[in-house]
């Protein structure tokens, strides 16, 4: 009896297998479209649960329409890399369809995909099509959709209710489209969204509260969006966010205010941004942060004091491949007890302080290879390392300085050199050698230096003033880190600024040459005159007397203008407290030389000249026809004749009068001008008689009179 029962059970198993085989055979043969592959394949749900699904694979067949003989049991339909641009009703009988892949086809509109009644669909791939917009309710029938991949399209417009009905959506890929704005209303219909990739869109900027409806979001990718700033409240509402990427943007500083609004962030990617320095407070009180990436930053030069502060769960920091990163403050880390891995390779670091490493009690591995290391007292701790810290790729750690050790392995050199003090060395990439600034801007020059003992840093201005942390000035301010701030830059602020790093062993210096609007004033030149504005009939000049001249002893300044055509020379005395002068009633398109001489009570003089050409005059007269021109010429000719006769009469009368009082003016006259005297500005100048008279009266005593400075522009 037992044998009979066992045999019966075996028959049932065989029969079941036969039925299953026949069913699968029908799917794989009679109902499988030509050239497609139909089979049972492993399939993972959006929650990564393993299942097996009936799959029809029609990828890469250059199809222009969906095959018509699809089985209603199809669960996964793969139509990637075809030429399909529109469907009719081929999908309507696929009631069990859970995944549909239309990527790399020719759809331009979502409605043409034919998604109605696909209530079981959980995953939809529409990437790499030609879709340009998403209209309201275009996906409303996909109530069970959990994954939507619509990246790498041409989408420039998404209506406010485009995602209506997608309350179960978990993953949304909108990256690599043409979106210029991010509308928070999109996300009102997707409260359960966990992953959002919206990078590589040319958005104008991120707004405050942009992602507020996404309280369940765990991962946000904002890569490649040309972002220059992140508003302080842009990430408000993302209380569940664990991973955030700002990879490959244009951020020039860490968006610290925005990051403080993401309390549960664990992974932060700031790689490939032009951030200049990591400053105090940039990463502070981020209590859940575990990994931080600041790699491939072309402009990063320093990690300053307390840049990473109170990060109790941070275990890994990557700061690699930063070609200008040359300085890490000895107190860069504070209250970072869990850090195990510190990657600092392929930078421009000369050293890492022992105190920096000692501030990380749980450090297990450090990578500082492929840096231009200085093999002196600053890195002696490497040779005397008594901890369990492991150096990554130690054979790639070579000395770059001092010159006698260049190219040798670090450990071999440190055995020979055991000095405890060494000279300061200014990090060469912290500030540029040359800069050109615009008038009115503010300049920051970051000077950083490493030495034992720690050096003092101060700056010297182009005129020799020493700027320290204690200096009180509206123009200059020096931070304890060594950053010089120059406010409201003017042309007279141009010149050579010298950073000095000094300790008991000596000093190191480095110079930054600053131009303002393309102008560079020589710091050794006490006086400098320059042109501020040029018009067709006027020139506005200004000058600067550097403060290392005893300006309190300067009694007079004189300006001499030489006019090439017509040739007129005059001088005018200007009080020292006037630094700007307007020379008017000049000739258009004419070359002039303006010279300024400054003298003190000891008769010491400084002279500065500038060449300038007035602009071409703008003529408003426009004669439209020949007859009008002829008539006008006749009238003007008549007027010219009358004026000429009158001028001759006046001239004869004046010559007659001149004979009567010639000697009373002789001491003021040297040369005759072809420009009317009453049109020259300033009005009080020294004149010379014509050459014929000058020969007769060459011995006359000439004394320039003081200029009426009430008509000059007083700026200081």
From Swiss-Prot:
Domain LRRCT, which positions? 371-424
Region of interest (Disordered), ranges: 692-716
Q: Which residues form the signal peptide?
A: 1-25
Instruction: Give membrane topology per the record.
Output: Single-pass type I membrane protein
Q: What is the tissue localization of expression for this protein?
A: Expressed in brain.
Q: Which UniProt keywords apply?
A: Disulfide bond, Glycoprotein, Immunoglobulin domain, Leucine-rich repeat, Membrane, Repeat, Signal, Transmembrane, Transmembrane helix
Q: Which GO terms describe its biological process?
A: positive regulation of synapse assembly
The record's annotation in Pfam families points to: I-set (PF07679), LRR_8 (PF13855), LRRCT (PF01463)
Disulfide-linked positions:
447-499
Q: Which Gene3D superfamilies match?
A: Immunoglobulins, Ribonuclease Inhibitor
Q: Which residues form the LRRNT domain?
A: 26-72
Q: Where in the cell is it found?
A: Membrane
Q: Which organism is it from?
A: Mus musculus (Mouse)
Protein name (database record) = Leucine-rich repeat neuronal protein 1
Q: Where are the LRR repeats?
A: 73-95, 96-117, 120-141, 144-165, 168-189, 192-213, 216-237, 240-261, 264-285
Compositionally biased, Polar residues: which spans? 702-716
């Amino acid at each position: 009896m037992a044998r009979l029962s066992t045999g019966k059970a075996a028959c049932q198993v065989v029969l079941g297998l036969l039925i299953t085989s026949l069913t699968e055979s029908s799917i794989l043969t009679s109902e499988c479209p030509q050239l497609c592959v139909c089979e049972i394949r492993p399939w993972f749900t959006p929650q990564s649960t393993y299942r097996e699904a009936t799959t029809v694979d029609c990828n890469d067949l250059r199809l222009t329409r969906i095959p018509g003989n699809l089985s209603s049991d199809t669960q996964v339909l793969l139509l990637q890399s075809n030429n399909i641009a529109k469907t009719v009703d081929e999908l309507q009988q696929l009631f069990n369809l859970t995944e549909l892949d239309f990527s790399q086809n020719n759809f331009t509109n979502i409605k043409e995909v034919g998604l109605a009644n696909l209530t079981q669909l959980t995953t939809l791939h529409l990437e790499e099509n030609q879709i340009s917009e998403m209209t309201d309710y275009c996906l409303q029938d996909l109530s069970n959709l959990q994954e939507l991949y619509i990246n790498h399209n041409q989408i420039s417009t998404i209506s406010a209710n485009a995602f209506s009905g997608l309350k179960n959506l978990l993953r949304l890929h909108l990256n690599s489209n043409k979106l210029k704005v991010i509308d928070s209303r999109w996300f009102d219909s997707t409260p359960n969204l966990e992953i959002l990739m919206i990078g590589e869109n040319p958005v104008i900027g991120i707004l405050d509260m942009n992602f507020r409806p996404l309280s369940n979001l765990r991962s946000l990718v904002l890569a490649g969006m040309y972002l220059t700033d992140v508003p302080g409240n842009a990430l408000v509402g993302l209380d569940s966010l664990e991973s955030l990427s700002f990879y490959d943007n244009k951020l020039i500083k860490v968006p610290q205010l925005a990051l403080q609004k993401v309390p549960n962030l664990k992974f932060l990617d700031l790689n490939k941004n032009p951030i200049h320095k990591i400053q105090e407070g940039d990463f502070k009180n981020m209590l859940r942060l575990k990994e931080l990436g600041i790699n491939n930053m072309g402009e990063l030069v320093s990690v300053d004091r307390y840049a990473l502060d109170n990060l109790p769960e941070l275990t890994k920091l990557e700061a690699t491949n930063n070609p200008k990163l040359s300085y890490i403050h000895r107190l860069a880390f504070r209250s970072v007890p869990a850090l195990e891995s510190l990657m600092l390779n392929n930078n421009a670091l000369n050293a890492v302080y022992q105190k920096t490493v000692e501030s990380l009690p749980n450090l297990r591995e450090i990578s500082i290879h492929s840096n231009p290391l200085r093999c002196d007292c600053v890195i002696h701790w490497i040779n005397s390392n008594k901890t369990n810290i492991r150096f990554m790729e130690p054979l790639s750690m070579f000395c770059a300085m001092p010159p006698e050790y260049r190219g040798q392995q670090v450990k071999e050199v440190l055995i020979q050199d055991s000095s405890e003090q060494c000279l300061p060395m200014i990090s060469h990439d912290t500030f540029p050698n040359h800069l050109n600034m615009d008038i009115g801007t503010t300049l920051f020059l970051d000077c950083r230096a490493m030495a034992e003992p720690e050096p003092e840093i101060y700056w010297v201005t182009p005129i020799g003033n020493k700027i320290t942390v204690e200096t009180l000035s509206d123009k200059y301010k020096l931070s304890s880190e060594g950053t010089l701030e120059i406010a409201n830059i003017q042309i007279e602020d141009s010149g050579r600024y010298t950073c000095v790093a000094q300790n008991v062993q000596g000093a190191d210096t480095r110079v930054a040459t600053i131009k303002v609007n393309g102008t560079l004033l020589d710091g050794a030149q006490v006086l400098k005159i320059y042109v501020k504005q040029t018009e067709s009939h006027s020139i506005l000049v200004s000058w600067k007397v550097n403060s290392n001249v005893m300006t309190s002893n300067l009694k007079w300044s004189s300006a001499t203008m030489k006019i090439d055509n017509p040739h007129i020379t005059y001088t005018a005395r200007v009080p020292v407290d006037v630094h700007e002068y307007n020379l008017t009633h000049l000739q258009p398109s004419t070359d002039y030389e303006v010279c300024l001489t400054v003298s003190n009570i000891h008769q010491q003089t400084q002279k500065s000249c500038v060449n300038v050409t007035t602009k071409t005059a703008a003529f408003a007269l426009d004669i439209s026809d020949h007859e009008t021109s002829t008539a006008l010429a006749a009238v003007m000719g008549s007027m010219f004749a009358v004026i000429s006769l009158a001028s001759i009469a006046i001239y004869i009368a004046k010559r007659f009068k001149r004979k009567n009082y010639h000697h009373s003016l002789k001491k003021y006259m040297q040369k005759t001008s072809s420009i009317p005297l009453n049109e020259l500005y300033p009005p009080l100048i020294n004149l010379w008689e014509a050459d014929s008279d000058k020969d007769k009266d060459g011995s006359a005593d000439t004394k320039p009179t003081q200029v009426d400075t009430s008509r000059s522009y007083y700026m200081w």
